[in-house]
């Protein structure tokens, strides 16, 4: 089920919302025990548009993917149980952005982080 959800998040149906773009920004590197704050800016659609989940995923060295969590168009959040206690996803609808904050990072959090719809 997790793989299906991830594939769905990464799939864009041709011709539907094809002009939607997501751009991550934040610090390149952080040290263990520090926190990270990432921003995803969405263009081409409002993040309050119905029935969309705005997600954060990460890709570990070796290409393993992990879903971190999402914020629903209605601001409901859901998290992967693994990093849940250290993770917060929020949004700013006035800027059409959503955010990932993770605390108490360890070497095991080394990954490339992506936002996705």
Curated annotation (Swiss-Prot):
Keywords: Adaptive immunity, Disulfide bond, Immunity, Immunoglobulin, Immunoglobulin domain, Signal
GO biological process annotation, one example: adaptive immune response
Disulfide cross-links: 40-115
Coiled-coil spans in chain: none
Domain of life: Eukaryota
GO cellular component: extracellular region; immunoglobulin complex
Entry keyword annotation includes Disulfide bond: yes
Gene3D superfamilies listed in its UniProt record: Immunoglobulins (2.60.40.10)
Pfam families found in the cross-reference section: V-set
Domain Ig-like: 19-117
Signal sequence interval, chain numbering: 1-18
Record protein name field: Immunoglobulin heavy variable 3-5
Naturally occurring in which organism (per UniProt): Mus musculus (Mouse)
Primary gene name: Ighv3-5
């Amino acid at each position: 089920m997790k793989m299906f959800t991830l594939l769905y998040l990464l799939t864009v149906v041709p011709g539907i919302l094809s002009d939607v773009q997501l751009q991550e920004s934040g610090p390149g590197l952080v040290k263990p025990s520090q926190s990270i704050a990432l921003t995803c800016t969405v263009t081409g659609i409002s993040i309050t548009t119905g029935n969309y989940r705005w997600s954060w995923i990460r890709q570990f060295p070796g290409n393993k993917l992990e879903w971190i969590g999402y914020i629903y168009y209605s601001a409901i959040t859901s998290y992967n149980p693994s990093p849940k206690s250290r993770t917060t996803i929020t949004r700013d609808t006035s800027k059409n952005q959503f955010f990932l904050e993770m605390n108490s990072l360890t070497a095991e959090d080394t990954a490339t982080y992506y936002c996705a719809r």
